[in-house]
Amino acid sequence: MISAIEPKNLLRPHSQPVVTTSTLQPDDECNIELRIEDTTVDKYPAKQHARRVAAEIHRDRGLVYLMGQKSTLYEDSDQERTFRQRRYFFYMSGVDEPDCDLTYDINADKLTLYVPDFDLKRTIWMGPTLGREEALQRFDIDEVKYQSSLDEDVKQWAQNQGRGSTLYLLHESQKPAEKVPNVFIDSKTLKHAMDTSRAIKDEHEIGLIRRANEVSAAAHIDVLRGIRKMSNERDIEASFLNTSVSLGAHKQAYHIIAASGSNAATLHYSKNNEPLKGRQFVCLDAGAEWNCYASDVTRTFPMTSQWPSAEAKHIYKLVEHMQESCIVRVKEGVRYLDLHILAHRSLIRGFLTLGIFKGGTLEEIQNSGASNLFFPHGLGHHIGLEVHDVSPESIMAQDNGDYSDNVLISPNNLSPCTTSSPTLKSGMVVTIEPGIYFSQIALDNAKPEQLKYVDLELVKTYMPVGGVRIEDDILVTKTGYENLTTAPKGDGMLEIIRQGDGSCNI
């Protein structure tokens, strides 16, 4: 680990279990130690975030108006939809409660939260909603008021500001219910300002992502411990969910992908219902969410502590090398595009060694786009309040264009990247998730220039491998990186399977 940064105020809610994993020794048990820390909760830095957003707006006056997520019912039903807070609203409030809104007066530096008015019937049935005093204690807010005063407050603000004042909205559809006279509605500036702010995580946010990764690591370890007893993909999903919830993470950052065998060649496989018998690998892409912040962790493993075939071992070790080669190069100023290209070049070299690619040089194969048949997605993405988090510009531009001299790829390559890709900055958290997939659909629909260098007969022997992906969440620092993901992989992963708590049912 290079230049590790320990957040000063790592957030851990009151009386929640903390996960620590012991270092594996050859004959030791892998233990998860659960302890309860009774510490004071630091408030989510909503006011700091509001000021950062205002600085990106580049105006000294105006009112930011953000709507939280409302309680809604499923269509033709009296059952409420599962609540998921709007992430832009959370970023400037820290409030994970329904039916709230906020305003931020840039000139007055005043952040106001609006909470639901008291509803006796709802309180009897569902319990009390967020109140004013509770909200002031829990959140980094200047003032808390009831929803019933919101529209009138906005009108009063506009009147006090005079003609030409600006109301900043995230979307045109989210303007106040009542028309506000003499106000300019700006629904374009705010999103870019918030995307720019959200791309760089502060210490508090890093602490939340770290905590989400701690829970995910424990859940991945429990799957490895029990995999020899499991007989279906759904057992894997159930185990991961059980551990996550028991450690206080009631929500997943995304739908769990528990793909065995050829299912792992489907990048976002979601059925999770097929038997494990006869499958070489499971690709488990699963990450818990903590206080609205995501983790995104992928591990690929066999059903026993042995590599199921020589082909499976070759592909796993190659993906492992692809990932490690990219991670060690992460630091501020590095262009993420170059890491993506490096991963493709590592794949090509590996396939040339294995004989899967033949009849061409590294550059010829690279320019043909043949590696895209086996590695069809980008190297990764930002992560934060969204598992695919926002930024002011795409981490890898998705269109063709010119390439500068220092790029490891030629202009006619078919990879979907251009030099408009930005450089990494300290405080960004990105995933590094190379993969190799043996997809019959991809091969059947390949272009002739891509297949020119592929030994299709040899590929047949690799098809049972399905797919291998390894993914970690990486914090960018000025001089290097910190890997926030602690879930075991490689030999440590196999050792946990060996020490698992059941005989093999596969």
Curated annotation (Swiss-Prot):
The keyword Transport does not apply. Mn(2+) 1 binds at residues 296, 433, 471. One of its GO terms (biological process) is proteolysis. InterPro entries: Aminopep_P_N (IPR007865), Creatin/AminoP/Spt16_N (IPR029149), Creatinase/aminopeptidase-like (IPR036005), Pept_M24 (IPR000994), Peptidase_M24B_aminopep-P_CS (IPR001131), X-Pro_dipept-like (IPR052433). It comes from the Eukaryota. Its cofactor is Mn(2+). Binds 2 manganese ions per subunit. It catalyses: Release of any N-terminal amino acid, including proline, that is linked to proline, even from a dipeptide or tripeptide. The keyword Metal-binding applies. Its EC number is 3.4.11.9. Keywords: Aminopeptidase, Hydrolase, Manganese, Metal-binding, Metalloprotease, Protease. This is Probable Xaa-Pro aminopeptidase BDCG_04966. It comes from Ajellomyces dermatitidis (strain ER-3 / ATCC MYA-2586).
